Design a protein with these regions (language model features):
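Phosphate/pyrophosphate-recognition segments in soluble nucleotide-handling domains
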Residues: 132-163, 173
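Positively charged, aromatic-accented nucleic-acid-binding surfaces
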Residues: 153-166, 170-177, 184-187, 191-240
Length: 240
């Protein structure tokens, strides 16, 4: 019997119509399903199959009781993990690895930003699993030729940005701005060249360069990440 691991981003609130069509195909083919117990896509998938009275489903959890369970007719699989771990994401990785390795297919419904879904896509590729990715930012399935580590990583970074260390490594690889010798010199260089500004101890972006950055708000604090690829970095340098 074929099996599919269905997963996706916790930010997603509704299942797109094309995803529902795929779920109906899964029901028609009688696939065994592996799905987690998180909010977002996990919950939506459980609810959908419950409403469709489809019970060939394994709910995988690292806990004795799943965080979410739509139906008592679903089978529960408790996945063991390294008890020395403290981080929730690291613990949950054991569950995701189990579902990837025990299924023939991975079906990921991704917002382009979720790191957990990003890792599940990469794991499916590395494990040579059949893979289908629905990209909600463009409301479409990604073409098969895009489903490789390089393209998926570029797409993820396009949406989430690069850290200061990551952009420094890209700068050194491209041999642009060779006067920058340390990652922590990037911020000073950007301020000196009027790309970033400091006003009342708060960092802001010169609107001329706003497309090169991503501003994240986390618990009231703004964090600036770098969106530039090598071509954009070169363009920014030439425009100064």
């Amino acid at each position: 019997m074929s099996s599919v691991f269905i997963t996706g981003s916790s930010s997603i609130k509704d299942l797109p119509n094309d995803v529902i069509t795929s779920l109906e195909n899964i029901i028609d083919k009688g696939f065994e399903i592996f799905v987690g117990d998180a909010k977002g896509v996990d919950t939506l998938i459980q609810q959908y199959f419950y409403k469709r009275n489809y019970t060939n489903i394994n709910i995988c959890t690292i806990y004795e009781t799943p965080r979410y369970l739509a139906s008592n007719k679903f089978k529960i699989i408790q996945v063991d993990y390294d008890k020395n771990l403290f981080g929730e994401r690291e613990k949950q990785t054991y569950k995701d690895e189990f579902m990837t390795l025990n299924s023939n297919y991975s079906f990921v419904i991704w917002d382009g930003k979720s790191k957990g879904s990003f890792e599940n896509i990469k794991r499916a590729i590395i494990s040579n699993k059949k893979l289908k990715v629905f990209y909600t930012l463009e409301n479409r399935f990604l073409e098969k030729e895009l489903l490789n580590i390089e393209n998926i990583t570029n797409l993820y970074k396009q949406n989430t940005g690069y850290t200061q260390t990551e952009i420094y490594n890209k700068i050194k690889e491209s041999k642009i701005y060779t006067n920058i010798n340390k990652a922590n010199e990037i911020k000073k260089w950007l301020i000196d060249n009027d790309i970033l500004k400091i006003y009342n101890d708060k960092l802001s972006i010169n609107q001329k360069y706003k497309n090169y950055f991503i501003v994240e708000n986390y618990r009231g604090n703004e964090n600036i990440k770098y969106k530039a690829n090598s071509a954009k970095l070169k363009s920014a340098q030439q425009s100064i």
